[in-house]
Amino acid sequence: MKQFRIHKDDKVMVIAGKDKGKIGKVLKILRNKDRILVEKVNVAKRHVRPNPYRQQPGGIIEKEMPLHVSNVMVVCDACAKPTKVGYRYTEDGKKVRFCKKCNEIID
């Protein structure tokens, strides 16, 4: 299984595409497609048919569409900048992620 340096509930910034510069929270990671869903970013309108069995009304809904993982960067809470993420081990042997700009632990 692929290892992404981006995890669910991380704050990320879009660095390429039509939503460049927007910041949002990661909702879901689609590892087999190298894509992630980011809250209120890359929103598209979808036409939905009514489904009486699920009590779902029809109409036009706005839905987040997946972004490629290479088009986003993690935003560090300490320095509030988009940054690369590295891994290191703490004294007790636990593997943690850290910000490569300010050296603070992200997890």
From Swiss-Prot:
<comment type="similarity">
    <text>Belongs to the universal ribosomal protein uL24 family.</text>
</comment>
<dbReference type="Pfam" id="PF00467">
    <property type="entry name" value="KOW"/>
</dbReference>
<dbReference type="InterPro" id="IPR008991">
    <property type="entry name" value="Translation_prot_SH3-like_sf"/>
</dbReference>
<dbReference type="InterPro" id="IPR014722">
    <property type="entry name" value="Rib_uL2_dom2"/>
</dbReference>
<protein>
    <recommendedName>
        <fullName>Large ribosomal subunit protein uL24</fullName>
    </recommendedName>
</protein>
<dbReference type="GO" id="GO:1990904">
    <property type="term" value="C:ribonucleoprotein complex"/>
</dbReference>
<keyword id="KW-0687">Ribonucleoprotein</keyword>
<comment type="function">
    <text>One of two assembly initiator proteins, it binds directly to the 5'-end of the 23S rRNA, where it nucleates assembly of the 50S subunit.</text>
</comment>
<keyword id="KW-0689">Ribosomal protein</keyword>
<dbReference type="InterPro" id="IPR005824">
    <property type="entry name" value="KOW"/>
</dbReference>
<keyword id="KW-0694">RNA-binding</keyword>
<comment type="function">
    <text>One of the proteins that surrounds the polypeptide exit tunnel on the outside of the subunit.</text>
</comment>
<keyword id="KW-0699">rRNA-binding</keyword>
<dbReference type="InterPro" id="IPR003256">
    <property type="entry name" value="Ribosomal_uL24"/>
</dbReference>
<comment type="subunit">
    <text>Part of the 50S ribosomal subunit.</text>
</comment>
<dbReference type="GO" id="GO:0003735">
    <property type="term" value="F:structural constituent of ribosome"/>
</dbReference>
<dbReference type="InterPro" id="IPR041988">
    <property type="entry name" value="Ribosomal_uL24_KOW"/>
</dbReference>
<dbReference type="GO" id="GO:0019843">
    <property type="term" value="F:rRNA binding"/>
</dbReference>
<dbReference type="GO" id="GO:0006412">
    <property type="term" value="P:translation"/>
</dbReference>
<dbReference type="GO" id="GO:0005840">
    <property type="term" value="C:ribosome"/>
</dbReference>
<dbReference type="Pfam" id="PF17136">
    <property type="entry name" value="ribosomal_L24"/>
</dbReference>
<dbReference type="InterPro" id="IPR005825">
    <property type="entry name" value="Ribosomal_uL24_CS"/>
</dbReference>
